A protein has these predicted regions:
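Nucleotide/phosphate-binding site architecture used for ATP/NTP-dependent chemistry
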Residues: 2-462, 491-639
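Short loop/turn and capping residues at structural boundaries
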Residues: 153, 482-483
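Short, well-ordered beta-to-alpha junction loops that form the rim of enzyme active sites
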Residues: 337, 483-484
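Conserved kinase catalytic-core helix
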Residues: 456-475
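Catalytic-loop of the protein kinase fold
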Residues: 476-482
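Hydrophobic residue at the +6 position relative to the catalytic HRD Asp in the kinase catalytic loop
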Residues: 486-488
Length: 639
């Protein structure tokens, strides 16, 4: 009879070896403190920008109070257009609420600042010797932020997961801005580590384990093989762009070896290969969602595991989209992944995927036919094909949920073969990137180009702000031009054009203009002022607010000059196309203040209903438009 000790500790011959625990990122104490301070600085900046916090002057800085009115945190900041707060990370401190017996503030460990009980510890530490804690700030300010008890644990988890992602990046070597300015798109993409400029919890990837992050997170840059499944064709949707038929789709997206091997797997399973289509799957998704969650489909052989593909792929910033590193000129593959990040489960809906190629073809056509967009070097990256499996019980139930977004994929053309000789590319996120020494990549591009800061900024706006505005003004069409959906075309660091991508879910036609059959879902008719938010919120507040401050605070370009150049670029468009400006006014004095973090705090796992995004949005009054100052005198200056 085996005793209890033997049962608890089986021999090496019989026990299953467990993986070694993953070690925490190797940050020294000061780097760990700096990480906390950077998160806190962004938190106080963006939460103040969204008017959830109301900073009060206090000495050389500002304090924010909890729901009782007691000051809890102190920071120093400069203020900029669009109510941007540029918070000094080294100044952030949690306030010691203690008082001495005489009712005066205690000065233990730091210098007192005006106000009863307000003590700011000196030297970068709190009174107990620790660094400030971003999660503690959320706890202190929970009621002020409107964060419910139900959502609090989810947001704290998301915030910690974001910090884990940041810590992993900071523990690894990284190139300088000057080095990155001479790098190609895949390398630039790997080292863009700022995350979304507005969201505080911006790269949580909740559900992706620590060891899994080492394998599949974009910053790891580890090449991986995708898992391939065969899905019964009668239970699947396959949509192809105008350039493809079934034969060309298979030839383009599978190697000859994969085609032969996958067909052999199906024949060996007693199945007819012609009755199946193939789906690329993230290895994490197969292990965590499909095999355990869709086992009946596997047992029925409605889904058949084909194995790994021949090519190696690398995850991009969006986590679920892959670049083919074996042949970077081949299409990107976008896969479903049941991980929560920045307010959404990163799955893919077969129903949504079905229309993607048609939407992409339509958008590609209207931009190619537009002389102005061609002049500006704008090109839509077409989504050549999509596939989705709908034979599972969740689809049969008729209930729409995240469980119906588990198995689908999309192929999108790569920008690399579309670059002209001498051009290189980088995600728009690069203009907001700074290296470990605080040097902006934008500054390094300016230096490489040999242009002045004014000339470079004007060129950037000519291929970003103005084309997005032109699409809205001339085509009643709004895209989501955030920093991942735009890829800049650069020549020696100088902007000469842009690729637009990933627009099937993030494009909207805002009028009753005719649309091709099958893509009516992208129509979202709104009033003129709400239409303007496609520029005011998504471009001015979402991207250019941060860029203007970055260039200003690093001494590259004064922010007043930045906004003057932006106004001038739009004013010249208005002169050329006055007929497009009759209904919309991008120079209006103010616009509705749409708030992203308010959405995330309301529900960290489902910020908006993608089928009804407009009604999901949250507003906090109005923002003054920095373009309005130059309404009547934008002309002249930099050309």
């Amino acid at each position: 009879m085996t005793d209890l000790g033997q049962r608890q500790h089986p021999t090496d011959d019989t026990r299953r070896t467990a993986p070694h625990p993953t070690r925490a990122p190797g940050l020294d104490r000061e780097t760990a403190r700096a990480l906390q301070r950077d998160v806190l600085a962004k938190m106080f900046s963006e939460f103040s920008h969204e008017r959830m916090l109301t900073p009060e002057p206090c000495g050389d800085g500002w304090t924010v109070a909890d729901a009782s009115g007691a000051p809890r945190w102190y920071f120093e900041a400069t203020r900029h257009p669009l109510e941007h707060w540029e918070v000094d990370p080294d100044s952030v401190h949690r306030i010691d609420p203690g008082h001495g017996p005489d009712g005066r503030p205690r000065e233990r460990g730091g210098a007192a600042v005006p106000g009863p009980g307000v003590v700011v510890p000196a030297g970068g530490r709190e009174a107990d010797g620790t660094a400030p804690d971003a999660q503690q700030a959320v706890l202190d300010l929970q009621d002020v932020l409107g964060l419910s008890d139900e959502m609090l644990p989810l947001y704290l988890e998301d915030l910690s997961a974001t910090m884990f992602s940041m810590a992993r990046r900071r523990a690894a070597p990284a190139p300088t801005a000057a080095e990155l300015a001479h790098s190609e798109l895949p390398e630039v993409e790997r080292f863009l580590d700022r995350g979304h400029p507005g969201f505080v919890a911006s790269s949580g990837r909740v559900g992706l384990g620590a060891a899994e992050a080492e394998a599949w997170a974009p910053e790891a840059a580890e090449p991986t093989a995708l898992t391939w499944l065969a899905a019964r064709r009668s239970l699947s949707t396959v949509s192809l762009g105008v350039e493809l038929d079934d034969e060309e789709h298979v030839r383009r997206h599978l190697t000859a070896g994969e085609r032969e091997r996958f067909r052999a797997v199906l024949r060996d399973a007693g199945e007819d290969p012609d009755e199946y289509t193939v789906i690329p799957v993230h290895p994490w998704q197969w292990e965590h969602r499909i095999l355990p969650g869709m086992l009946p489909d596997v047992l029925r052989r409605d889904l058949v595991l084909l194995g790994e593909g021949d090519h190696l792929w690398r995850a991009q910033q969006s986590l679920r989209t892959f670049l083919d590193v074996t042949d970077p000129h081949r299409d990107y593959a976008k896969t479903a992944m049941g991980v929560h990040s920045m307010g959404f489960l990163r799955g893919l809906s077969p129903a949504y995927m079905r229309a993607m190629p048609a939407i992409s073809d339509w958008l590609y056509a209207i931009t190619e036919e537009d002389e102005f967009l061609r002049e500006r070097g704008i090109r839509v990256l077409r989504e050549h094909a999509s596939v989705g499996y709908t034979g599972d019980a969740h689809h049969r139930s008729g209930v729409r949920s995240d469980y119906t977004k588990q198995l689908a994929a999309l192929w999108r053309e790569s920008p690399l073969p579309l670059l002209a000789p001498g051009e290189h590319a980088a995600s728009l996120a690069g203009v907001l990137h700074t290296d470990r020494a605080g040097r902006p990549l934008a500054g390094a591009w300016i230096e490489r180009s040999g242009a002045s800061a004014e000339e470079w900024v004007r060129a950037l706006l000519d291929v970003y702000l103005v084309p997005v505005a032109h699409l809205l003004l001339s085509q009643d069409t709004a895209m989501m031009p955030h920093s991942e959906n735009v890829i800049l075309r650069l020549r020696d660091g100088f902007p000469v054009g842009a690729f637009w991508k990933d627009l099937g879910e993030e494009v909207a036609v805002l009028s009753n203009r005719p649309l091709p059959e099958g893509i009516e879902r992208i129509r979202a008719v709104t009033d003129p002022e709400e239409r303007e938010l496609a520029v005011h919120t998504d471009v001015l507040d979402g991207v250019l607010r941060h860029l203007a401050v970055l260039l200003h605070t690093t001494g590259i370009l004064d922010e007043t000059q930045f906004w003057r150049i932006a106004a001038q670029s739009l004013d010249e468009h208005r002169e050329r196309f006055p007929e497009h400006w009759r209904e919309l006014d991008l120079f209006r004095e103010s616009f509705a203040h749409s708030c992203l973090n308010r959405l995330q705090l309301r529900n960290p796992q489902r910020m908006v209903d993608l089928a009804n995004q407009s009604e999901s949005l949250t507003y906090a009054g109005r923002l003054e438009n920095p373009l309005a100052t130059f309404r009547n005198h934008a002309r002249g200056g930099v050309r």
